[in-house]
A protein has these predicted regions:
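Short juxtamembrane and helix-loop transition motifs at transmembrane-helix boundaries
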Residues: 35-48, 75
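Extended, low-polarity transmembrane helix blocks
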Residues: 1-34, 51-59, 63, 70-124
């Protein structure tokens, strides 16, 4: 198991990718608790009951964010993050009717981060 100093050695590109993959979950976790429109997505994606799934999503995102940032069980956390983001890709695809570009609500952003997390899981 790597030491704390090894986990935060920013001369190692893998550590930078791992930390960023975890950190980028933080605004999404925040939104699930403090942005009312977040629930609307879970309703539109037909997750039933939507509020429960929104909190399940927040719990998964919190767990993988902490694990990835700190370098704890990296391979498993990154694999779970990639799976979670793949489910998000499918949900966004269904809600938007297949839009690609993230700036018009498409799934491009989720797919990019799912791939990044998969790379971290393979290296982890």
């Amino acid at each position: 198991m790597p030491s704390v100093t090894e986990n935060f050695d920013l001369t190692n590109g893998f550590n930078i990718l791992r930390i960023i993959c975890g950190a980028f979950f933080v605004p999404h976790i925040y939104a699930k608790f403090f942005v009312p429109e977040a629930l609307g997505f879970f309703v539109a994606a037909k997750f039933r009951p939507p509020k429960v799934w929104m909190y399940v999503s927040a719990a998964i995102e919190t767990a993988v964010a902490v694990a990835l940032v700190l370098g704890i069980y990296t391979m498993y956390a990154a694999a779970l993050a990639a799976l979670h983001l793949t489910i998000a890709v499918v949900a966004v695809y269904r809600v938007t009717g297949g839009k690609w570009l993230w700036n018009i609500g498409g799934y491009e952003y989720c797919l990019f981060w799912a791939i990044c997390c998969a790379v971290v899981a393979m290296h982890g």
